[in-house]
From Swiss-Prot:
PROSITE patterns: RIBOSOMAL_S7. InterPro entries: Ribosomal_uS7, Ribosomal_uS7_bac/org-type, Ribosomal_uS7_CS, Ribosomal_uS7_dom, Ribosomal_uS7_dom_sf. Keywords: Ribonucleoprotein, Ribosomal protein, RNA-binding, rRNA-binding, tRNA-binding. Belongs to the universal ribosomal protein uS7 family. One of its GO terms (molecular function) is rRNA binding. It comes from Aeromonas salmonicida (strain A449). GO terms for cellular component: small ribosomal subunit. HAMAP family: Ribosomal_uS7_B. It comes from the Bacteria. This is Small ribosomal subunit protein uS7. One of the primary rRNA binding proteins, it binds directly to 16S rRNA where it nucleates assembly of the head domain of the 30S subunit. Is located at the subunit interface close to the decoding center, probably blocks exit of the E-site tRNA.
């Protein structure tokens, strides 16, 4: 943490094709080894697959999928007198998006389709329908928070 001043959050440029900041952030999450053009090709390919498969607006499906994955609460470990408690805390909006995108990409990488674009499209469509591994991950996190609701007073 800086001692002098709070460092401002760097403004992310919107996506060149659709003009969406959220999609630009998602392209960055998909990116591996700094290969942004490859990442963009994967994401745009996935959106094209979504448009042909579902017949709906691909950006709307993307937004809906992220909405279904975003966690409201998560648990954080808090040590109190020799015991470690899993304390449920509310997730900040920026972290909600970051977690949703990370879970979505992780779930897509574990799928069985041939190309990454197909995996991503499949996971996005599943998430939009409230199915898939990424939605299950969100449910697991919410379940953990619900189970540890008794320790909510340890919040910091």
């Amino acid at each position: 943490m800086p001692r002098r001043r709070v460092v401002g959050q760097r403004k992310i440029l919107p996506d060149p094709k659709f003009g969406s900041e959220l999609l630009a952030k998602f392209v960055n999450v998909v990116m591996v080894d700094g290969k942004k053009s490859v990442s963009e090709a994967i994401v745009y390919g996935a959106l094209d697959i979504i448009a042909t498969k579902s017949g709906k607006d691909h950006l709307a499906v993307f937004e809906e999928a992220l909405d279904n994955i975003r966690p409201a609460v998560e648990v954080k470990s808090r040590r109190v007198g020799g015991a470690t408690y899993q304390v449920p805390v509310e997730v900040r909006p920026v972290r909600r998006n970051a977690l949703a995108m990370r879970w979505l990409v992780d779930a897509a990488r574990k799928r069985g389709e041939k190309s990454m674009a197909q995996r991503l499209a499949g996971e996005l469509l599943d998430a939009a329908d409230n199915k898939g591994s990424s939605v299950k991950k969100r449910e697991d996190v919410h379940r953990m928070a619900e189970a540890n609701k008794a320790f909510a007073h340890f919040r910091w």
